[in-house]
Amino acid sequence: MATPTQSPTNVPEETDPFFYDYATVQTVGMTLATIMFVLGIIIILSKKVKCRKADSRSESPTCKSCKSELPSSAPGGGGV
């Protein structure tokens, strides 16, 4: 049986900078995941994502992006 050559010294333990309260991390993570999931479902099911007034001449920011995707709604009615 081997004996230690030095006696153990009492070194004050420093606080670990990577110590996490895993219960809190898990709770916050699940809460954020739930919120993002519900917001994603709301965005998918929302009618506001689609451009309902693509035929009108209003220049709302939503319809501006829709008009760039639809070649038939371009001025002059020409295709790309």
UniProtKB/Swiss-Prot annotation:
Changing T5A: Does not affect interaction with NKA. GO terms for molecular function: ATPase binding; ion channel regulator activity. Residues 1-22 are extracellular. The modification Phosphoserine is found at S73. It is found in: Cell membrane. It comes from the Eukaryota. Glycans are attached at T3, T5, T9. It is a single-pass type I membrane protein. O-glycosylated; required for stabilization and translocation to the plasma membrane. Residues 46-80 are cytoplasmic. The chain crosses the membrane at residues 23-45. CDD domains: FXYD7. One of its GO terms (cellular component) is plasma membrane. One of its GO terms (biological process) is regulation of monoatomic ion transport. Keywords: Cell membrane, Glycoprotein, Ion transport, Membrane, Phosphoprotein, Potassium, Potassium transport, Sodium, Sodium transport, Sodium/potassium transport, Transmembrane, Transmembrane helix, Transport. The keyword Transport applies. The transmembrane domain is important for the interaction with NKA and with the functional effect of FXYD7. Regulatory subunit of the sodium/potassium-transporting ATPase which is composed of a catalytic alpha subunit, a non-catalytic beta subunit and an additional regulatory subunit. The regulatory subunit, a member of the FXYD protein family, modulates the enzymatic activity in a tissue- and isoform-specific way by changing affinities of the Na+/K+-ATPase toward Na(+), K(+) or ATP. Belongs to the FXYD family. Associates with and regulates the activity of the sodium/potassium-transporting ATPase (NKA) which catalyzes the hydrolysis of ATP coupled with the exchange of Na(+) and K(+) ions across the plasma membrane. Reduces the apparent affinity for external K(+), an effect that depends on the presence of external Na(+) and voltage. Increases the apparent affinity for intracellular Na(+). This is FXYD domain-containing ion transport regulator 7. It comes from Mus musculus. The lineage of its organism: Eukaryota, Metazoa, Chordata, Craniata, Vertebrata.
